[in-house]
């Protein structure tokens, strides 16, 4: 494996940078594709990565980035035209004779899903499977620990975790464990060819248990507050700049939030895929949370307290984004009968006994065969 060069896309991001770092630690030659040079890319270069700057939507730049590599970790941009990027990489991989593609996808991916990004994740998975003579492995996590920990500043300052769970539980994985599964697949892609893995944490947690773990990491009591999805989405709008959530991200998030009450994150979880592929036990939520508590926004200062209190107040004032209107104005296509994952017979078939994650996948059934 040490003679095989691996390309990681979106290498400055949290998951891809972890993939790059872990590969370098194992002595694997890496090429880190970034959108621009900055402190993050400089760090990867200092660790020994070859850093290339490329636009993931430009086929010529993509082809140049792929040329000379043997394996690709495809981490898609969260963008309405993400499928264009996937096609560009598939074409480049085919022309360059890439040996393997390990692609980061979504546990919710379905051709019926109301989120454009999630439907395109499903199509991307099908696309890479079509590449002849190229091993393909899917890494499809659900709702990450990182998503919950974006609320750590409020938990630190106000002692509350306002989160809509609908009574559902989740076993959220760390970015590092997601990366470990991807690295395991990249090191031995032919062993994992045709498989889909869903990294999770070691235990299903309720909202209250997530709040308790945050509180232990912070050294203070944190109380989970069940709030409706619409209120959470207003809070996301208030904090959108800090979170890095543009309107397209918010349009998808509103659908993902509804899955918790339907038990979607509990289906098949927790998995053993981190242990099976990476050979280590998955990190528990408390361990993950402790890595986040040193940030400047979690420090107990008067300024941070007032900032979080003001954001909390703004949540009750600002109007909601009209996200359905946004989708229409952006001309985002919709399936004839959009369904959440838990409501989709296709999704249940692909994620149930006929298409179990971690074993060789069956080809997806035709949508016409699964009418709910």
Question: What are these language model-derived features?
Answer:
Residues 54, 227:
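Cofactor-binding loops of NAD(P)H-dependent oxidoreductases
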Residues 46-53, 161:
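Active-site regions of enzymes building and remodeling cell-envelope glycoconjugates
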Residues 1-43, 57-60, 67, 78-81, ...:
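Oxidoreductase cofactor-interface core, primarily capturing Rossmann-like NAD(P)-dependent enzymes
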Residues 201, 215, 230, 290-294:
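Short amphipathic alpha-helical surface patches that mediate protein-protein
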Residues 233-372:
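A hydrophobic C-terminal alpha-helical subdomain
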Residues 175, 207, 229, 284-285:
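Structural motif detector for alpha-helix initiation sites
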